[in-house]
Every structure is written in C-alpha cells, then in structure tokens.
Amino acid sequence: MEIVIEWRSLSDRKVIDPASHLSEWIENNPGCKIYIGCDSSNLGPSTTFATVIVLHKENKGGHVIYNRISESRIKSRYERLWREVELSVSAAHLLASWGFGKPDYIDIDLNPDPKYQSNTLLSSAVGMVESMGIKPRWKSKSPWAISVADSICR
C-alpha cells in the first residue's frame, strides 16, 4: 500500500502541487534560500511528523509548504529523532526530483550539548546530510525550519 503525502501551503493550509507551487514562488522571488526540516510529537497511539520546506527571501520574509504524516507511536526517542532526519533527507531528494537542486540547508532537531539525549545522534545525522552535499544546521545554528515544523506537528 502506497502512502499518499499531501503537501500544503502554510499560508492557507490548502493542498497544493508542490513542484508547480515552488516553481511559481521561486520565479517570483529570485534569490530565495531553501531550508528543509522535520519535527515530531507523540500523542496517543501515534507519532506525527511535520516536514517543511521553507523558502526564505532575505529581509523580506518567506513562504512555507509542509506535509504531516502519522505513524504508529515510536516510543524510542532515538528512533523518532532519526526518522525526522530521514524525512528531511527524503524531502531534499524530492526537491531535486522536482528540478530545484539541493536546499541551502537541512535543519536537524538535535542538540550539540552532551547533556541532551539527541546529542548522541548529531554526528551521524550531520554525516548523512553532508554526504548529500547539503549543509546541516542544528539547535545552536538557528534552524528556522525546525521551529516551523514544531508548530505544525503539534
């Protein structure tokens, strides 16, 4: 069974065709930066993931498209955080398949401070993202896409 993922515009929450939507926005806003990120939350029997593509126009704001998927609850924090990285990387592959090349950044919801559990995944996640030729950003490096994804998945 194939999972159908609906992409939506954050501004009006309407379902969109992501490739044509991004193409039109980028054409009207040349020079914009593209960031990708994912966040998740557990509620009841499900884990909900929100993956976002942020189009940022320097000093002019931006635009966000996103999708939300729910899976059976992932109890392991490590597995859930790693799934966030996987979904961000998948979105980067989609972006390339739509003809937009690589994003400027993939923002990952991991902390460089060893006192946080997510720290143990940071080097692996950074390696995965960098192996694709994409720059990663994490908690101390202003990961905008994660902030947006956090508000969507809740």
Which role does the model predict for each range below?
Residues 1-35:
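Basic, amphipathic N-terminal segments that precede the first structured/catalytic domain
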Residues 71-99:
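Acidic helix/loop or adjacent segment enriched in Glu/Asp that either coordinates divalent metal
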Residues 36-37, 41-65:
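Acidic, metal-ligating active-site segments
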Residues 112-142:
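Short, low-complexity, polybasic intrinsically disordered segments
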Residues 103-110:
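Short glycine-rich phosphate-binding loop at a beta-alpha junction
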Residues 1-6, 10, 115-117, 130-132, ...:
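N-terminal targeting/trafficking signals and adjacent low-complexity tails
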Residues 41, 48-50, 136-137, 141-154:
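C-terminal edge-of-domain segments
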Residues 45-49, 114-121, 148-149:
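A short acidic (Asp/Glu
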